[in-house]
Amino acid sequence: MKYREAKAEDCSQIYALVQETIKTVYPKYYPAEVVEFFSALHSPDNIAQDIGNRTVAAFYEKDVLIGTGTCRENHITRVFVLPAYQGQGYGSQMMQYLEERVLGRYEKVCLDASLPACQFYEKRGYVTVRHETWKCENDVVLVYGIMEKDLTAKA
């Protein structure tokens, strides 16, 4: 797998990857209102803004964009792997790269964990430190975990 910093011209492809993953995976875990919330949260404008801030990584396997992740300071976000490539170790490789961007600058890395990803993050040494809520349409409430990993223990 190869990776590089995402560029402005990658925005539409990254957006398509994120949306495909949300629409394929999230309905198995969340009601439609929450799926739509996630879809809107990861809008082209939000992705473009992060690309402009040079915080987005693009991950490729044989010239195919298979994943993306964003790292702002010590906060990892918008980590998505195309459904066809999930369960093959790509997510772990992506997280290793993103965590290395934080290592040496911060003692901890944090992220907001969706239900589909909680176990994955726990296996990587993340612990849930609290839960947050977000009110979606039709009074549906999204509950998600705030997770942290101590990078000092990784020596």
Language-model features and meaning:
Residues 53-67:
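Conserved beta-hairpin
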Residues 93-109, 119:
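Conserved acyl-CoA
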